[in-house]
Each structure stands twice: as C-alpha cells, then as structure tokens.
Amino acid sequence: MIRWALIVAAASGLLAVALGAFGAHGLEHMLGERGRAVFDTASRYHFVHTFALAVGAMAPIAGAGRKPCVAACILWLVGTIVFSGSLYLLAISGLGWLGAVTPFGGLALMIGWFMLGVGAWRGPEVTL
C-alpha cells in the first residue's frame, strides 16, 4: 500500500464533496449555463481521479508493481490539480487563458492510467 497516496485520496475526496456542494448550492445563481457545465466537468474528473488515487494506492497489495503505481498516483494528483483546478477557476473567474492549461492536466491523468497498467503488467501474479 502507498500510505501517503491513500491519505491524499481521503483529503481529495473531502475536497471534491465540498467543492461539488459549493458548486451545486453556492454558485448555482452566480454561474451561467456554460460556467455550471465547466464546474460540473471539473467536479466529475476530481471525483473519478480521487477514486483512482485510492485504487492506485492499494494496487501493490494486489500485486501491481510499486514504482509504476507511485508514478500513477503522482500523475493523478498533479493531473487533478491542473485539470480540475484550472476548470474550477475558469468556471468561477471566467479567465479564458486557464483553458489552455487544462489539457496538460488531462495528459497527466492519461499517463497515470497508463502507469497503472504498467504496474499491473510488471507486478507478480498474486492470487487473493
């Protein structure tokens, strides 16, 4: 198990719920239709990659290689901050240049999934 990643996943899950509630209740009248859609996309990817981070943290228990799983966790953490963070800020602030940053976060998220696959491929076969 990658303990730090599981702790970060717990904190990220707490933040994802808080931001989702804030977006649904605190910002619903402030954001236009496009702003709500952008905020919802940020929230959805935040939740999905919080769960990915938790799974990646526990994958070595199931036999996945530890180093690729650590890389996956780091990439998902950075990717979530850059991808979802830029979208949250774009939705709230309307600063269009933030949209140019978002794809870099998406790329980190994709590479994280690839690294999880590498970890599963390289790890020893474990029967649970």
Indicate residue ranges for each PLM-predicted region.
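Polytopic transmembrane helical bundles with strong interfacial aromatic enrichment
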Residues: M1-L128
